[in-house]
Amino acid sequence: MDQIKKIIDNFKQTISSVDNQKELIVTKNIFVKKHVTPLFQQLRELEELAVKKAFGKELNFLQEAIQELFEEKNQQLVINLDQNQKPAYDLMIPALDLVDGSIHPLNLVVNQIVDFFKKFNFTIVNYPELVTTKHCFDDLNIPLDHPGRSKTDTFYVSDKQLLRTHCTAGTIEAIAAMNKHKDIRVISFGNVYRNDTDDATHSHQFMQMDFMWVNKDLSLSNLKWFVTKFIEHMFGNDLKTRFRLSHFPFTEPSFEVDVECWNCQSGCFLCKKTRWIEIMGSGILHPKVLEAAHIDPEKMVGIAAGIGIERIAMLKNNITDIRDFYFNDFRFIKQFYE
């Protein structure tokens, strides 16, 4: 206990000459790191339980004493500041001109997407980010052994609830609510979550958009035409597109949609030397998905597609690191305008 009292007296003497709050905080942090933290290291190394318990009580007393001295000194500095110093801001100085802000690049992309779907009378829906396994997986024909359902890939809150891994969890709810309509057009967008390690091209949270269009007269040619028009709206009319056969549990057939790289003719870093850039997934809604929404797949056909908002923004603006969108660095954000 003598050692503890010496440390307390030392701290009291150390802060006695401090004359501002910022210096007080820095002084306390340095003192604790130098004199207190090593004692906790010693505590962890003790093996005898009784000795460890007694030493732990002394360290708790030390922490409380240091915090009490810190708060007393801080209160004293506040009083001195009120009595002796002028206000930090001179209200008589004329204000500087306000600088116009700018819209976040992800919101710019969302606005552009919404403009396109409004022209085709789509209903925009927004559902909670906390969803059930029924809406996120079961209704979308995603089997129990699918990797996306594992706890290593998905953020579960309970056995039956999770943070949505795609916006389709909300879109399927929307078409189910409209299942008596002869023509159903729904778009959903918002945050989705995957248990990924954050790096230049991956994020545990990102934005996604998807749409479903259900009608008795739709076909594969309608899907190709509509997706092509969407890509032209987002990237311009001069890009070639291609549809590659793929597999998604909720569509059959399924396609990955690529656009010709606008940065090169023979391969570059952007297209990974392939001359093509993957844009989105699409397909004809699987009959089981329509049945889950209580829609007769013998009478109705659905087309669907989904895309990452960050991916569009990165491709449109040659951004190489997805994390730039989330650092809130105004130097980055102010570059983008409608």
From Swiss-Prot:
InterPro entries: aa-tRNA-synth_II, aa-tRNA-synth_II/BPL/LPL, Phe-tRNA-synth_IIc_asu, Phe_tRNA_ligase_alpha1_bac, Phenylalanyl-tRNA_Synthase
Main location: cytoplasm
Pfam family, one: tRNA-synt_2d
EC numbers on record: 6.1.1.20
Subcellular location: Cytoplasm
Free-text cofactor note: Binds 2 magnesium ions per tetramer.
Matches recorded under CDD domains: PheRS_alpha_core
Cofactor(s) annotated in UniProt: Mg(2+)
Reaction catalyzed: tRNA(Phe) + L-phenylalanine + ATP = L-phenylalanyl-tRNA(Phe) + AMP + diphosphate + H(+)
Entry GO terms, CC: cytoplasm
Superkingdom to which the source organism belongs: Bacteria
Subunit comment: Tetramer of two alpha and two beta subunits.
Family: Belongs to the class-II aminoacyl-tRNA synthetase family. Phe-tRNA synthetase alpha subunit type 1 subfamily.
Name the record gives this protein: Phenylalanine--tRNA ligase alpha subunit
Organism annotation: Mycoplasmoides gallisepticum (strain R(low / passage 15 / clone 2))
